[in-house]
């Protein structure tokens, strides 16, 4: 049997204590008299609502109202927050960041953050780890929260505004099935009813037990006609992926009945032609 160590982000485990909310839009209290609290703060934070979306950074200003441009060096990949299973994780920085958090009233308090350790060559991206981490650690005041957006204020007066995008679990109405799939280094031409000269990923399923031991022998590669959400194939690199597979309710006649969403890349191997 071949053993593959399943990698995971070294983020701190945590327990989220949330207060119930009677609606999807959080009620607000009158604004404080300080300059940094010009908008009302949320009276209670709906912890369940936090977990239904990915939260993509849409705007960030300092206490004087000046845009914090350094947080937007990756215009096509905004800094993103995810609240899931008692964890806050931060992605689209250089490294993945994560830390524990608690909810009380209108306060979202984030503990010290841990991160993966990798270098990034893009200008300004390495600095994102510090810029985002410093602003998200400590006590944040939630100014507003609904399905469309989240706005928080830091102790120093910075205001970060995020737009909400539903998670796959929210979009597909349930928890996906965990599967592992090996994607070969090169695509191959395949016959597609709608797309001329289509190139298919070459995939095969990989099975592990709960200890990470591979079970059985891998079969032959097969054409994969769909897309894997969140996965960008790099020719010449063979990957083992951990995926969530969702059943699509009432798909159109010419559309797939299942959706695959990338959870993590388990292993990668550079393959020479």
Residue ranges and their predicted role:
Residues 18-234, 238-273:
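Lipid interaction determinants
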């Amino acid at each position: 049997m071949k053993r593959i160590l399943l990698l995971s982000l070294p983020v701190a485990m945590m327990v989220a204590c949330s207060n119930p909310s009677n609606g999807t839009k959080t009620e607000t209290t009158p604004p404080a008299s300080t300059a940094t609290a010009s908008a009302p703060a949320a009276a209670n934070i709906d912890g369940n609502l936090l977990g239904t979306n990915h939260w993509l950074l849409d705007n960030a200003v300092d206490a004087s109202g000046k845009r914090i441009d350094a947080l937007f060096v990756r215009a096509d990949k905004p800094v993103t927050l995810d609240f899931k299973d008692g964890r806050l994780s931060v992605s689209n920085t250089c490294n993945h960041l994560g830390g524990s958090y608690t909810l009380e009233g209108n306060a979202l308090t984030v503990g010290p953050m841990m991160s993966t350790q990798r270098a990034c060559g893009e200008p300004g991206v390495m600095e994102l780890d510090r810029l985002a981490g410093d602003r998200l650690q400590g006590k944040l005041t939630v100014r507003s929260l609904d399905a469309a957006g989240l706005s928080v204020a830091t102790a120093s007066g910075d205001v970060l505004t995020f737009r909400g995008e539903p998670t796959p679990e929210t979009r597909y109405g349930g928890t996906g099935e965990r599967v592992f799939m090996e994607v070969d280094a090169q695509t191959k031409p395949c016959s597609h009813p709608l797309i001329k000269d289509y190139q298919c990923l070459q995939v095969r399923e990989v099975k592990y037990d709960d200890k990470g031991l591979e079970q059985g022998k891998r079969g032959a590669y097969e054409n994969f006609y769909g897309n894997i959400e969140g996965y960008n194939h790099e020719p010449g690199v063979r990957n083992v992926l951990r995926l969530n597979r969702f059943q699509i309710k009432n798909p159109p006649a010419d559309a797939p009945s299942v959706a695959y969403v990338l959870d993590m890349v388990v292993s990668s191997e550079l393959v020479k032609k």
